[in-house]
């Protein structure tokens, strides 16, 4: 459910007349080729509501995705998708997994920089997967821009949970001899989450909530988002999120990696992720700009 009509009335149409909005949507997105003034008027008056995907496209086109999240009311998730998602979450919260938990106070970090400078934070995890280690050795001297969202100790010498991001996936594809147009995966067009690890579901929701808001606020112009999912539960989750499999990386010990690509806006229009983005939008806005210079206690956020 969403009070999308109020969003159109109170945010979009304050600065953009209906006729101008209609033309802009038709010119920029093929999804709106069939949109006419009558259908748009029905959206504005609340007589009908576009899909979540089209809602996000409208918010993106008008550069007001944060305002859209403020207005958004959490959407219903199908029972089958909810079951698949909970299988993934339950794996994270397995008692066998929790034995790795630390009693130390944990902090949330966000770091940006060159790949070879930030990679040591995830190296202990990545190196355990032999094929990832080989790729890392091949690309460590390339000029790749990276970002790290992590939860760890105050000095950030030990990450307990993280999302590891690369701007561009073309270097990875070169290492895997993947055919096709590498420009689609350039730093300008693509962001890649090549490895994640979550010590608990609390960490998962916090990091994914921050990540979803980061993507929608700062990188909605990226054409592709590449994400690596590990294990059967990860593969099943990626499929219900609409991912297209690019490659799988076998690992019999730690679980196969399944690399999927997504359209950014279509991915985050999925109710599972859009609901998480909504729940964490205020935490993101209140704290994100401080994270680069000052880590924040997770106990103040969870």
Where are these regions (language model features)?
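Active-site-adjacent scaffolding segments
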Residues: 65, 74-86
């Amino acid at each position: 459910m969403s009070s999308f009509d109020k969003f159109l009335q109170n945010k979009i149409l304050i600065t953009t007349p209906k006729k101008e909005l209609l033309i802009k949507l038709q010119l920029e997105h093929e999804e709106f080729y069939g949109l006419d003034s009558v259908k748009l008027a029905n959206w504005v008056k609340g007589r009908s509501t576009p899909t979540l995907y089209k809602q996000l496209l409208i918010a993106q086109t008008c550069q007001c995705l944060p305002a859209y999240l403020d207005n958004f009311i959490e959407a219903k998730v199908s029972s089958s998708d909810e079951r698949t998602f909970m299988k993934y979450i339950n794996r994270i919260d397995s008692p066998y997994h929790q034995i790795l938990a630390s009693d130390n106070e944990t902090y949330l970090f966000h770091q940006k920089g060159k790949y070879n400078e930030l990679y040591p934070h995830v190296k202990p995890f990545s190196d355990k997967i032999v094929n990832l280690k080989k790729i890392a050795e091949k690309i460590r001297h390339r000029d790749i821009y990276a970002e790290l969202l992590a939860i760890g100790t105050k000095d950030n010498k030990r990450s307990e949970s993280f999302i590891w991001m690369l701007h561009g996936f073309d270097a990875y594809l070169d290492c895997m001899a993947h055919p096709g147009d590498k420009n689609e995966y350039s730093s300008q067009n693509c962001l890649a989450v090549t490895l994640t690890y979550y010590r608990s579901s609390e960490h998962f929701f916090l990091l994914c909530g921050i990540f979803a808001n980061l993507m929608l606020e700062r990188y909605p112009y990226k054409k592709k988002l590449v994400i690596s999912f590990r294990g059967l539960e990860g593969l099943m989750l990626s499929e219900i999120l609409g991912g297209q499999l690019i490659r799988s990386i076998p690992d019999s010990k730690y679980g196969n990696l399944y690399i999927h690509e997504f359209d950014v806006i279509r991915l985050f229009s999925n109710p599972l992720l859009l609901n998480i983005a909504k729940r964490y939008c205020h935490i993101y806005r209140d704290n994100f700009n401080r994270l680069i210079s000052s880590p924040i206690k997770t106990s103040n956020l969870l």
